[in-house]
């Protein structure tokens, strides 16, 4: 089956992918902001780590947008919720970013359920790969705390 052929639950899948695009784009802003707010002896490696996370997150948004267009949909120009707590302690930043990654896992799990219901192996594998990546990000942040 071609990805542009009508899939069961296609509209729901495109909607969920757009939620993912918006979530990931908010992550780009979040991680870039965090990189600005790091001070102290560990600044150089931590700034690089957050900027790398921003780049990875932009890649996730791009992949979701490509999936949307492969399905004949239109990617959102929106951006997800941006939370500014004004807490820039490293532990607070790690906790906030871990919560962000957990939300990402939930979105990709919801997409996986829709993909399984639609019978699209491509979407299933995409969802599983991103769930694994996001879960590894959560584990990395848990280890840092």
Please report, for each region that a protein language model flagged, where it lies by residue.
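Iron-associated oxidoreductase/ferritin-like identity signal
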Residues: 1-145
